[in-house]
């Protein structure tokens, strides 16, 4: 992986996003480059990738810009996304991303069996109001033999939560998002590492890996949190159970 080249390409894509969204997406570039490295490692150009629940982020369009054939599945109904969805999805389409608008918790994935090299879902399953089990099994069924599944989620027992919850601070969602909106789309249940390993066993994945990172701290509004993240991140990577963001990478048997 040429990290500098990838970073430059993803930053150029972020600059094409409308208005303030460009700044928001630019802050996400390090996370997106890391996610791309998990998904694309060792793949030849032209490999097929599906991203489930990727929304308007840079992952799918970034993978397409790097030469992959990409399908993005999402309902795009997050409140803040609706006014800008069409403009951003046009950027995706120009680079060849196939857009499949659907709520995967209610509608089955419309994938042919054994048709994808990699399927990913980042920061999505914790929002689902139905069990993710059925959809995850559909993802594995759509992978080619030896295909890669990558799941990224927030860690419900990361170090920050272990420190702040005893102090009475640790709400997952704002009152406005939970109480005032017609449909709650926040976090329903955040997993931990034991949950990811449970999923891996249920899906019969092989060669599984668990990784940890701490992306949220880098873009926190709190300067002390940003500084603490910079100082602690390299150490915490060795202890994924304490990290804010955890990943499962596994392969279809």
Identify the residue ranges that each predicted region occupies.
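Hydrophobic/aromatic anchor residues within beta-strands of the central parallel beta-sheet
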Residues: 70, 99-101
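Conserved SAM-binding loop of SAM-dependent methyltransferases across substrates and taxa
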Residues: 56-68
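Conserved SAM-binding motif I beta-strand of class I
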Residues: 69-75
């Amino acid at each position: 992986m040429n990290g500098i080249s990838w970073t430059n390409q993803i930053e150029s894509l972020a600059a094409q996003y409308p208005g303030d969204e460009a700044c928001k997406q630019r802050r996400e570039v390090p996370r997106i480059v890391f996610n791309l490295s998990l998904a694309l490692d060792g793949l030849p150009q032209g490999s097929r990738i599906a991203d489930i629940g990727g929304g308007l982020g840079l992952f799918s369009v970034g993978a397409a810009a790097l030469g992959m054939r990409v399908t993005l599945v999402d309902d795009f109904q997050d409140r803040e996304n609706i006014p800008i969805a069409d403009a951003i999805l046009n950027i995706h389409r120009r680079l060849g991303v196939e857009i499949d608008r659907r709520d995967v918790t209610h509608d089955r994935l419309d994938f042919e069996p054994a048709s994808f090299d990699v399927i990913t879902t980042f920061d999505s399953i914790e929002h689902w109001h139905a069990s993710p089990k059925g959809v995850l099994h559909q993802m594995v069924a759509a992978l080619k033999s030896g295909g890669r599944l990558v799941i990224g989620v927030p860690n419900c027992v990361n170090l920050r939560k272990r420190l702040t919850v005893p102090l009475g601070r640790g709400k997952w969602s704002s009152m406005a998002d939970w109480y005032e909106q017609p449909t709650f789309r926040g976090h329903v249940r955040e997993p931990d590492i034991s949950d990811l390993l449970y999923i891996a066993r249920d899906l019969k994945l092989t060669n599984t890996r668990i990784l940890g990172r701490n992306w949220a701290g880098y873009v926190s509004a709190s300067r002390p949190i940003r500084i603490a993240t910079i100082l602690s991140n390299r150490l915490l990577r060795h202890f994924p159970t304490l990290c804010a963001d955890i990943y499962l990478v596994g392969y279809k048997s």
